[in-house]
Structures are given as structure tokens and as C-alpha cells.
């Protein structure tokens, strides 16, 4: 009897395409091969077969593969049909599959969810895979690949093993202490807890993975008609903002996300900053939004008079027909957005600054959920350092282990899993 449904989905690009790969996972995967291809090929070897429906009508000539579980991507029996990628072919093969008993279409992320449920991947790896599927820049790809490949999971396992060792040491002290005497932990025990807590604190101080999705935020600011929109267009390499010799043309915040040298950026063009009491209320709203954007900036390019911009702003001397400011004596960059002179040097400097603020290539980066769980573990270890009663210390170490288990998914809730795997596309 088949208790768990077998699922299938198109796992390659949408038709029309050169090849369409339909993946089938579950207890009826072998039966699906027998029904459509009339045979089961040798495991893990591609074999050419004619696919037919229940009435014997020819559907396609395709490569078929058979992967018996549990050593598969999902931990279940798995079959693949590599068909011609025409829309009608894919529809016909899927129609034949859905007519089989115990077989249904997969939901978004269901293949990955089964891999998680069957222990093929843990939660941190699944989150890394979700990030990898949505990665648009080289830096996003590298960070997601590190987590999907288990870099964070292996590190958490090492931390958990160290906590287990500390817990065993506490239990040993409790077991061999006299009832009359208070049990005491050796001084080295406290040092070891402190070292581990310090290591977790260092990880907690690293840039979060969400920064990669948001990108390094660069806000262009200055008074009206300072050349902000012209430089903005040059940086994003498109006519995203309207440019005009009329002061106050930009009245709202304009954002564009781009990648430079594989690093994600969000460039923000803003309304010109000036006093507008009694003036156009729409322009006043734009100026308020510009000030809000400045408060959230990672870097500010100031195109106004020298020294009048926000603290730590990059002084930019933009050479154009529309600027009439006195020359900047200490400009970080002198450029012409119209001709492009100096823009490349500015981009190079922005990339260097962004690399220091974003997760490093190939380094595992924590998302908000992982950061919260690691923070729980660090908090438990810091608390354990301050305690002298071994029983209380043992409880704090248990709390740290639970936090590690939650981080990699040994203890999870269905709602959280639904949210995660709902991010995946159908067929993954």
C-alpha cells in the first residue's frame, strides 16, 4: 500500500525548450517508469525509451533515468524523463503521469521539503538553496552556495559537539561530587565556555545575508540642479531619472538595483535639499523622503557645496553645465557624468567599500532566523559563565544545544517550514 503520494513536476525551464526534464519522486516512481517506458533502466544510467500513455499512444522518445532511494536528491525513489521540450510534449507526459494511482503534481518546494524530511539536507542548507535560486549577483551566488553546501551546518555541528563535551564535563562533576560538598567546576571549564561564547559573538557581528538582497545602499544627495540625476543615470547605466536644467525636477526618491563587479548595489536618487517653507508641498514631501533615505544609506555621494553634506559623506565634484558651486578643495572624486570621466574610479571605490560591508565571497552569512537562534545560544553560554552551581550551568548548556538544533532544523515548526519551502519554484 502506498501511503505517501508520489510527486512530479517539470524541473527544467518552461517550454518551449530544447529539453524538458520531468522529475518524479516517491514510492510510485518505479511504477511510473514501467507505465510510461515499459521498463526500468539500470540505476543511474540514461536509457532511450518510447513513452506511451495508458492507451498505448506514443507520447515522445526520451531519455529515462532511475535512481532508487534512499541515496537520491530527495531520499526517495526518483525517476526522470528527459523529453523534447515542446509544450505539447510536456503536457502529454504530465497528463499520463497524473492519471497514475498515487501520483500528483508537486507543490512549490516540495522536492526540497522531502529532501529535508528525509535527512538529505538540513534547514540551513535548504535556506541556502532558496537563496541560491534567487541569486542575481556573483556575491549573492557565492554566499548562498556556501550555505547550500553546508558550510554553516558543519560549523554549527562543531559548536554543538563542543557544548556536548562541556555538558559531559558538568555531568562528571555532578556524578562524582560528595553529597556534603558543593560540586565545583575547574577553571579551564569557564575558559572553554568563554572562548566558545566569544566565537559565537564574532559570528553574530558579521554582515547578515539580508544585506546581499538589499545591496549596498548609495544615496545621491545635494541641492537642486546639482547633477544628481545625471550621475545616478551614469551609475545605473540607464535613463532611469529625468534630467533637466530646471531646478527641482526630481521630486521623489528613485531607486535602482544593479550589480557592479558582481556586488549588489541599490542606488538612490533624491529630491534636491533646500528650504521650502511656503513653497510647493509636493517638493517638501520629496525632501522629507530624501532625508529618510539619507538615514538608511550605507554611503552618501554629496554633490552640494563642500562641507554642507551629512557627516562622512563622499564629496563629489561633478563637472557639468548646471553646477555653479565653488570648486571643492577636498573632493573625494572629480568627475563628469556627461562624458563619463571619473565615473569608473567612483564605481571602483564603491565596490571596495561594499565588499567591506557585505558578507565576504564564499563565507556563510546568517539570515534573521539563524542570527536569532545563534544569539540564543550565545546568551545561554554567557549566562553559564556567570553561574557557579553545576546544575544551573547544565541547564544553560542544554539551552545552547536546543538553539543549535533549531538553527539547523532538528527542532522546527510546520508554519516555519511552510514559509521557507513556499519560496521555491515548482519542480525544486
Per-range role (PLM):
Residues 24-26, 85, 270, 306, ...:
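Residues immediately flanking
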Residues 1-142, 146, 150:
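A glycine-rich (often HGG/GG-containing) alpha/beta subdomain
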Residues 25, 93, 222, 269-270:
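A secondary-structure boundary/capping signal
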Residues 48-68, 248-278, 299:
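Switch I (G2) and immediately adjacent beta-strands of P-loop GTPase domains
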Residues 87, 120, 284-287, 340, ...:
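Short, solvent-exposed loop/helix junctions and linker helices
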Residues 66, 79, 271-302, 306-309:
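Switch II of P-loop NTPase G domains
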Residues 1-14, 127, 136-259, 265-267, ...:
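C-terminal-of-GTPase-core extension/linker across diverse P-loop GTPases
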Amino acid at each position: 500500500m502506498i501511503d505517501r503520494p508520489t510527486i512530479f513536476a517539470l524541473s527544467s525551464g518552461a517550454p518551449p525548450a530544447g529539453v524538458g526534464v520531468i522529475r518524479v519522486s516517491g514510492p510510485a516512481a518505479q511504477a511510473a517508469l514501467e507505465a510510461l517506458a515499459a521498463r526500468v533502466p539500470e540505476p543511474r544510467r540514461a536509457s532511450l525509451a518510447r513513452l506511451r500513455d495508458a492507451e498505448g499512444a506514443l507520447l515522445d522518445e526520451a531519455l529515462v533515468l532511475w535512481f532508487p532511494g534512499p541515496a537520491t536528491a530527495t531520499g526517495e525513489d526518483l525517476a526522470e524523463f528527459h523529453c523534447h521540450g515542446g509544450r505539447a510534449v510536456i503536457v502529454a507526459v504530465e497528463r499520463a503521469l497524473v492519471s497514475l494511482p498515487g501520483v500528483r503534481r508537486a507543490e512549490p518546494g516540495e522536492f526540497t521539503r522531502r529532501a529535508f524530511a528525509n535527512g538529505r539536507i538540513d534547514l540551513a542548507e535548504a535556506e541556502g538553496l532558496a537563496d541560491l535560486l534567487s541569486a542575481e549577483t556573483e556575491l549573492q551566488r557565492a554566499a548562498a552556495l556556501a550555505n547550500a553546501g553546508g558550510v554553516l551546518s558543519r560549523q554549527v555541528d562543531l559548536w554543538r559537539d563542543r557544548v556536548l563535551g562541556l555538558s559531559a564535563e558538568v555531568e562528571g562533576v555532578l556524578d562524582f561530587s560528595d553529597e556534603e560538598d558543593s560540586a565545583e567546576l575547574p577553571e579551564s571549564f569557564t575558559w572553554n565556555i568563554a572562548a566558545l561564547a566569544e566565537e559565537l559573538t564574532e559570528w553574530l557581528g558579521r554582515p547578515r545575508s539580508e544585506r546581499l538582497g538589499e545591496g549596498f545602499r548609495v544615496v545621491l544627495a545635494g541641492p537642486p540642479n546639482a547633477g544628481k540625476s545625471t550621475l545616478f543615470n551614469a551609475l545605473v547605466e540607464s535613463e532611469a531619472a529625468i534630467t533637466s536644467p530646471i531646478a527641482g525636477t526630481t521630486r521623489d526618491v528613485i531607486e535602482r538595483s544593479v550589480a557592479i563587479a558582481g556586488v549588489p548595489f541599490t542606488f538612490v536618487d533624491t529630491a534636491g535639499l533646500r528650504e521650502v517653507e511656503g513653497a510647493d508641498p509636493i517638493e517638501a514631501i520629496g525632501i522629507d523622503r530624501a532625508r529618510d533615505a539619507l538615514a538608511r544609506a550605507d554611503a552618501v555621494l554629496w554633490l552640494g557645496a563642500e562641507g554642507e553634506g551629512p557627516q562622512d559623506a563622499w564629496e563629489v565634484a561633478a563637472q557639468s553645465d548646471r553646477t555653479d558651486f565653488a570648486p571643492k578643495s577636498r573632493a573625494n572624486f572629480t568627475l563628469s557624468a556627461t562624458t563619463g570621466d571619473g565615473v569608473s574610479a567612483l564605481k571602483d571605490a564603491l565596490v571596495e567599500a561594499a565588499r567591506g560591508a557585505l558578507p565576504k565571497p564564499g563565507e556563510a552569512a546568517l539570515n534573521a532566523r539563524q542570527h536569532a537562534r545563534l544569539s540564543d545560544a550565545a546568551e545561554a553560554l554567557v549566562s553559564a559563565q556567570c553561574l557557579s552551581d553545576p546544575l544551573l550551568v547544565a541547564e544553560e548548556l542544554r539551552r545552547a544545544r536546543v538553539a543549535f538544533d533549531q538553527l539547523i532544523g532538528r527542532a522546527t515548526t510546520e508554519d516555519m517550514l511552510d514559509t521557507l519551502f513556499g519560496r521555491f519554484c515548482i519542480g525544486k
